[in-house]
């Protein structure tokens, strides 16, 4: 038996906590025997004193074990359970293609996703732009979809890592969100509850990233890889670029439209293709579905070319109560905005920099995201045909096409787009889409 205040005191004085002490505290968070003040105190001591790798592993596993952990053995699946997690960005629609692509190559992807947070779009919000799409199937149905289709994308239920929800709510109001050990545990507790064999992390870098600097993004990636491997799940991470909108669109329905076009081959944004393929390659290699990069890329290209990935996306949508013919008739089903027109730069030039965070917030301001949990989303609004870094813009080539609910909203968004995109008289140097691969 431990005392919460003694655990806090021990960490306050700079000592490492034992696995038993950490589990006692996390179970107390779950059971409401630890007060909010005590949670806040421990969070602040961790913020200032950090945690060793063994402590981080213990914290992550204790938070994972505070709820149910999915077990797939009874399904006798003939492939690995794999997933991807992104730290979030703007126009980051990779999950919608990646899940079906990896499933088409023999993986099983039980993806538990989130809603939009701040300037970043949420995979669940995007999928809810599809009429009828059910993000909360019951456990039996979820397992059926994984076995039959190979991929399902659902929301977090109250039974998964419940201690994390209360811990995060306290961190949010005590300025302790941006602590690497606490971020690591929060992300991995939910992901490891999926019962994974392998995980790939997509950690964003740049003006639209969660972490403000390259160094902090790299530190977070290294922490997650170290802890997840320490917890027994094969994990790698990619540092990917978020200095511009990743896809050609940003919003909900507009990104779903682009995802379908990507899968069918109608249109593939080159940067989105690079990042999606790189993440899928990691999943295939970590899941032992391919021996190397070349074999993985060949398999992935094949399932795009032969339509198998698009078919699996369509089957997932239908299995989660969306339309049976969504892939074939997406334009009929996705909501469209009342007003769609282009915004042009005031001068000619090359796009030299982009405040990606500001562009994400512009989508939120149009109604495409939430400022608070009770807000409703306008799934139709957003940007398409986004200019990319290095593009020459003028009276013919717009900065973006804005999809808005009315003229006032369009004008506000146009102002935000112009302010967020810098022009220069010469093109900037090209930056990579993937900066670094991190392994244990």
Swiss-Prot record:
UniProt cross-references to PANTHER family, sorted A to Z: THYMIDINE PHOSPHORYLASE
EC number(s) stated in the UniProt entry for this protein: 2.4.2.4
SMART domains listed in its UniProt record: PYNP_C
Pfam families registered for this protein in UniProt: Glycos_trans_3N (PF02885), Glycos_transf_3 (PF00591), PYNP_C (PF07831)
Gene Ontology biological-process entries: pyrimidine nucleobase metabolic process; thymidine metabolic process
Gene source species: Enterobacter sp. (strain 638)
Quaternary context: Homodimer.
Protein name from the UniProt record: Thymidine phosphorylase
């Amino acid at each position: 038996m431990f005392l919460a205040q003694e655990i806090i005191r021990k960490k306050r004085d700079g000592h490492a906590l034992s696995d038993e002490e950490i589990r006692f505290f996390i179970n107390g968070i779950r059971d409401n025997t630890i007060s909010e003040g005590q949670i806040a105190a421990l969070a602040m001591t961790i913020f200032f004193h950090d945690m060793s790798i063994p402590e981080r592993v213990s914290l992550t596993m204790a938070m994972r074990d505070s709820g149910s952990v999915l077990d797939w053995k009874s399904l006798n699946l003939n492939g690995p359970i794999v997933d991807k997690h992104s730290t979030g960005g703007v126009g980051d629609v990779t999950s919608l293609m990646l899940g079906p692509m990896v499933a088409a190559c023999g993986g099983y992807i039980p993806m538990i996703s989130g809603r939009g947070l701040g300037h970043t779009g949420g995979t669940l919000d995007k999928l809810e732009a599809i009429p009828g799409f059910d993000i909360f199937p019951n456990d039996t149905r979820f397992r059926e979809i994984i076995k039959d289709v190979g991929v399902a994308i659902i929301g977090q239920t109250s039974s998964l890592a419940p201690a994390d929800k209360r811990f995060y709510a306290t961190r949010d109001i005590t300025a302790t969100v941006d602590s690497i050990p606490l971020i690591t545990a929060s992300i991995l507790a939910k992901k490891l509850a999926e019962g994974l064999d392998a995980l790939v992390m997509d950690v964003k870098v740049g003006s639209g990233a969660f972490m403000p600097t390259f160094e902090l993004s790299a530190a977070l990636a290294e922490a997650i890889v170290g802890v997840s491997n320490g917890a027994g799940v094969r994990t790698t991470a990619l540092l990917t670029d978020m200095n511009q909108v990743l896809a050609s669109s940003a919003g909900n329905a507009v990104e779903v439209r682009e995802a379908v076009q990507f899968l069918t081959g109608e249109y593939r944004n080159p940067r989105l293709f690079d990042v999606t393929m790189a993440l899928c390659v990691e999943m295939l290699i970590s899941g032992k579905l391919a021996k190397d990069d070349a074999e993985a890329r060949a398999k992935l290209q094949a399932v795009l070319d032969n339509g198998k990935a698009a078919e699996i996306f369509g089957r997932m949508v239908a299995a989660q109560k969306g339309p049976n013919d969504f892939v074939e008739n997406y334009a009929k089903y996705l909501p469209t905005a009342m007003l769609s027109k282009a915004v042009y730069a005031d001068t000619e030039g090359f796009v030299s920099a982009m405040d990606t965070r500001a562009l994400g917030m512009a989508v939120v301001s149009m109604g495409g995201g939430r400022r608070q949990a009770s807000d409703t989303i306008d799934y139709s609004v957003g940007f398409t045909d986004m200019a990319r870094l290095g593009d020459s813009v003028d009276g013919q080539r717009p900065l973006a096409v804005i999809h808005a609910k009315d003229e006032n909203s369009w004008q506000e968004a146009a102002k935000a787009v112009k302010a967020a995109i810098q022009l220069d008289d010469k093109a900037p140097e090209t930056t990579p889409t993937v900066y670094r691969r991190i392994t244990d």
